[in-house]
């Protein structure tokens, strides 16, 4: 795990590229459909699956618009469909990871984003797709996703008043035939039987064979495949990610690009917090956010040194800041956002980190505990 340097003296630093605000494409009158269903306006334009079958990218965006120093133009869609993620105007991109994802969209590369929890791996792919107006479907490969879920199955349906057996496509053949960016979340938690179904489509022009249908599906030219994972397929030596599995290295070899997205620089993390929690976008609020990020860095360094068994992710820091804005109490928000999840024996250490950064003793700290005993 890479860390920022500090007085603790037991971590290496990791630099992140500069943060960038990405201009969104004009979307005309059509907006992405809300989660509750499809709006009439979207349905009238291009929201149905059948219309997606013929949809192709019809414009391009320069990679430099994403803050990436590369001479690359990325295919994009001029209009949105219901499958396009919502744009987060406050999102900050990591240049290296963004470049890898853009290459996946532009050159049909299979891209895996690996990193620790809460670093924004899935959101990174979603926000690039959102700005390209590229339809995206996200599948969480938990232990209950089966081969039938992905490939499909025979189902009994009513036709002309009669019960007949009909094959219902799973999500994989449905997506392969359309201009969909398919994102497999928690890729290293997938069951082996499911992973081998995915293996064939990992090749750039890999055709999907449906044995039950005696049918071979040719991928849509704009079909793209991405994945996120906490590990690199060699198991979990940290003990943080129970449920992950070693991955077949023959399958890992089929991923064209593997990029790492781990913890960010302190300045980058503070910028993300300011964008996510506008209430702290003041001089005093900035000082509070700086202290929050320092606490998070100390937990990461403590993990590397073996003092802690858990770390504070960027997602947790955002949650802490949001809860602090809700309750108006930074210490209480810290307790309910992170401290209560720590091992009882490790809470005094975490409370000490908090005291170093905020100059305030928590009830869990060693000093406060000793004072109460006296």
Predicted ranges, named:
Residues 1, 22-25, 30, 38:
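Short hydrophobic transmembrane-like helices used for membrane targeting/insertion
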Residues 2-4, 14:
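Low-complexity, intrinsically disordered or signal/transmembrane-proximal segments
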Residues 5-6, 20, 45:
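Serine residues within intrinsically disordered or low-complexity segments
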Residues 11-13, 32:
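Residue-level detector of structural "landmarks"
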Residues 31, 42-43:
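Long, low-complexity intrinsically disordered regions enriched in Ser/Thr, Asp/Glu, Pro/Gly
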Residues 45-286, 294:
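AAA+ P-loop NTPase catalytic core and its hallmark functional loops
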Residues 45-81, 98, 265-266, 270, ...:
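Alpha-helical lid/collar subdomain of P-loop NTPases
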